[in-house]
């Protein structure tokens, strides 16, 4: 009986701790987030070689006019998107996914005066590790992806708040849906 009480006491303690963490979580950066971002990658995971292709495509040695023209291709349809598909050797949805991953890992800057260009982070990687061979480069890219609450909410939440020792799709989905409910996010997919 003493052992059962002890286990029960520990269980209650763990539940109370979890509730404190949950309350704290809702007072952290997630509390102020009004519009989470869960899409944009067209269901494609980040693939080997995509970031390198973007660094080559937006090579900083090119003239501004050429970069401006290339930047516009990413936001167009018809023949221009067909040119991009040929340049990258992928379909239309993959072109959009490549742009998404390059933006969210901060390889490209989408807010420059000329449209898209390599960010200072992208230029540094292109100069010192263009094929992403070094583990520290991959760690930095991972950190960039997981530290942007506004643009990659799932990654931010998973690596900063999700408290399970093992991650399953169902656990993560349920946890995100609970967060959506707690935060009263409207318009997020159920």
Where are these regions (language model features)?
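Short, positively charged and aromatic/hydrophobic N-terminal segments
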Residues: 9-23
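Donor-sugar nucleotide-binding helix/loop cap in glycosyltransferases
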Residues: 24-190
């Amino acid at each position: 009986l003493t052992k059962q009480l002890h286990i029960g006491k520990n269980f209650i303690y763990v539940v109370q701790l979890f509730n404190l963490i949950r309350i704290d979580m809702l007072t952290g950066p997630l509390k102020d987030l009004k519009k989470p971002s869960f899409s944009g990658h067209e269901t494609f995971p980040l693939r080997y070689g995509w970031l390198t292709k973007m660094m080559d495509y937006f090579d900083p040695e090119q003239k501004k006019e050429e970069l401006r023209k290339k930047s516009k291709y990413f936001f167009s349809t018809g023949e221009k998107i067909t040119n991009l598909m040929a340049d990258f050797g992928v379909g239309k949805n993959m072109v959009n996914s490549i742009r998404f991953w390059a933006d969210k890992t901060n390889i490209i800057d989408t807010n420059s005066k000329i449209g898209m260009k390599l960010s200072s982070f992208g230029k540094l990687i292109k100069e010192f590790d263009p094929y992403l061979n070094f583990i520290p480069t991959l760690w930095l890219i991972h950190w960039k992806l997981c530290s942007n609450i506004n643009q990659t909410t799932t990654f931010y939440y998973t690596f900063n708040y999700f408290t399970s020792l093992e991650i399953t799709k169902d656990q993560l989905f349920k946890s995100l849906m609970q967060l959506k409910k707690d935060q009263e996010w409207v318009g997020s997919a159920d």
